């Protein structure tokens, strides 16, 4: 059924009784809806449906897949506790699984692993990333739209060549320092946009001359803000207003959500090819696993092949093959589940 904006929802206790489920189940469902911005909780009144624009259903049409076609050095300090934002519990790294997959990759003198690979990244890895993003993050794309590179900084530099260095970039204020450094060093005009409790202020964004807005909707760094659906729609509307406008969605740390299900990606709501989606395995596996990925909208994919398709891949085929099997054989999902428990 459909509920009108402002409609009051039954209490978790009453809903649990009506559905014959435990109250904890209905509480979890309401918490998920709250975190995504579909409902709001008013003190002493209850839960109410939020006013949001009509949602656009983005369907995956199963387009036939085409056939193949700088970080500072870390010093070794003996800290008892690492409070740095890049801190990873390396004691929990799956050494046995990684060692096994490394041996399998090099078995029988596999010479192909040392030949020149696909510039966008190995097709098998891009297929695996596509499948994972679709199931875990609600991202809709083809493997051909995915670029694999050695970290988000490299991919942002590559993106800069596609959009042109005169293109203005709007950044959340505060924002991820490395992204700011990359765009500033490349000469892009920077427009800091302040935030409220729901993320980047779109009215302030509209007053800038930016054509690109860099946002972290599912876990903003460093504030931890989750952008609700209404604000996400406003950002998409801003991007749709003019040709050449795009949103960069940095899906930083989205794997580690400890209450409810992970928030779906903004890219999955986009029906106009306006979102450039970015992610990395450095945070979820280990900082030394310098494998990031970027999903380009179709118009930018054509531009990439024209302007930057000649660049060689920055990730070795050996590492890509290990990572591919790490995901396919279920090690990655098990590792994420374990780390959620450790970090909790």
Positions of the model-derived regions?
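N-terminal basic, amphipathic alpha-helical segments
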Residues: 1-103, 114, 299-300, 305, ...
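Residue-level detector of conserved, well-ordered beta-strand and adjacent loop positions
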Residues: 50, 84, 194, 267, ...
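Hydrophobic residues in beta-strands of the RecA-like P-loop NTPase core, especially within AAA+ ATPase
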Residues: 171, 248-249
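Conserved core of the PLP fold type I
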Residues: 112-243, 254-255, 261-269, 276, ...
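Short, solvent-exposed loop/turn segments at secondary-structure junctions
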Residues: 54, 86-90, 153, 175-177, ...
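Amphipathic, well-packed alpha-helical segments that form the structural scaffold of globular domains
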Residues: 99, 103-107, 130-134, 214, ...
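Active-site PLP attachment segment
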Residues: 44, 268-303
């Amino acid at each position: 059924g459909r509920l009108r904006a402002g409609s009051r929802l039954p209490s978790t206790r009453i809903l649990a009784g009506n559905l014959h489920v435990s109250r904890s189940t209905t509480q979890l469902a309401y918490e998920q809806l709250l975190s995504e911005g579909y409902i709001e909780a008013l003190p002493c009144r209850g839960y109410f449906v939020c006013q949001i624009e009509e949602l656009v259903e983005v369907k995956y049409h199963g387009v036939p897949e085409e056939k193949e076609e700088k970080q500072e050095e870390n010093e070794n300090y003996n800290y008892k506790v690492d409070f740095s934002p890049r801190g990873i519990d390396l004691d929990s790294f799956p050494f046995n699984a990684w060692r096994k997959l490394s041996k399998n990759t090099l078995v029988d003198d596999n010479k192909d692993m040392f030949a020149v690979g696909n510039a966008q990244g190995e097709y098998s890895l891009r297929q695996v990333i596509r499948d994972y993003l679709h199931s875990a993050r609600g991202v809709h794309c083809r493997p051909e739209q995915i670029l694999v590179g050695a970290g988000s900084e490299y991919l942002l530099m590559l993106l800069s060549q596609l959009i042109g260095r005169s293109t203005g970039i709007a950044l959340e204020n505060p924002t991820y320092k490395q992204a700011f450094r990359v765009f500033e060093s490349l000469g892009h005009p920077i427009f800091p946009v302040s935030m409220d409790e729901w993320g980047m202020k779109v009215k302030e964004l509209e007053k800038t001359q930016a054509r690109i807005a860099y946002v972290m909707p599912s876990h903003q760094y460093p504030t931890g803000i989750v952008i609700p659906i209404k604000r996400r729609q406003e950002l998409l509307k801003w991007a749709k207003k003019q040709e050449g406008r795009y949103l960069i969605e940095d899906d930083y740390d989205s794997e580690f959500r400890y209450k409810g299900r992970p928030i779906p990606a903004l890219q999955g709501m986009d029906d106009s090819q306006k979102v450039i989606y970015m992610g990395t395995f450095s945070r979820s596996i280990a900082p030394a696993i310098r494998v990031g990925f970027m999903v380009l909208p179709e118009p930018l994919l054509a531009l990439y092949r024209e302007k930057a398709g000649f660049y060689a891949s920055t990730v070795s085929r050996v590492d890509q093959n290990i990572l591919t099997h790490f995901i396919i054989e279920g090690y990655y999902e098990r590792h994420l589940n374990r780390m959620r428990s450790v970090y909790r």
